[in-house]
A protein has these predicted regions:
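Ligand-binding pockets and gating/stacking loops
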Residues: 1-191
Length: 191
């Protein structure tokens, strides 16, 4: 990896990155939007869409009403500003001072697939190295006998939001920065 050639010492040794495709909405977990409660039921302003087409799921709707989260939010001590979290995460709220919540990610994609590709690789176009590959490249490894990182798939009857291989691949990077898929059933690794 690149870690030995850094011009400064890396602050992180490990990263635990949880991406739950098809999980709860950010609006129901960490992204507190009090204005949505005030605007509940009003139609989505045209300037929010900024001329973008509407997805197929909503194209036949006559209106696009705003709606807040159904869950209560409280502010938790984390830094000078604190972190807002919903009642869905009571146990995480107890350790929020020890984690990093990133609430600034944005994509122009209006559909899940290109948006997920952007979150995982930094580009809406498939084929770029994943976050795991970049972390492997930047941090190096503490053990050459273990994979750079692992990807865990949940066992599900529905695969609408499956984590495609291209979302955790190395793209143009060397294969030693490739993660290993752990299966949820039977043998975790097929060898």
């Amino acid at each position: 990896g690149f870690a030995n050639g850094l011009h400064h010492k890396a602050k992180a040794k490990r990263v635990i990155y949880l991406f739950m495709s098809g999980g709860p909405s950010h609006l129901d977990l960490w992204d507190y939007k009090p204005k949505l409660s005030e605007e509940f039921g009003k139609d989505l302003p045209a300037n929010v869409r900024d001329g973008q087409r509407i997805t197929g799921m909503t194209s036949k709707q006559n209106s696009l009403p705003l709606a807040p989260s159904k869950y209560a939010f409280t502010k938790h001590a984390n830094n000078a500003d604190g972190v807002w979290g919903s009642s869905l995460l009571p146990h995480t709220a107890k350790v929020v001072k020890d984690i990093c919540v990133i609430n600034g990610t944005f994509t122009e994609a209006i559909n899940h697939d290109p948006a997920i590709t952007y979150i995982q690789t930094g580009s809406q176009i498939p084929g770029r190295p994943s976050l795991g590959a970049w972390l492997s490249y930047g941090l190096g490894t503490m053990n050459e006998d273990l994979p750079s990182y692992i990807v865990m798939h949940a066992k599900s009857k529905h695969a609408e939001q499956s984590l495609f291989n291209r979302l955790w691949g190395t793209g143009f990077m060397p294969s030693d920065h490739q993660g290993i898929l752990l299966r949820a059933a039977e043998d975790p690794v097929l060898y």
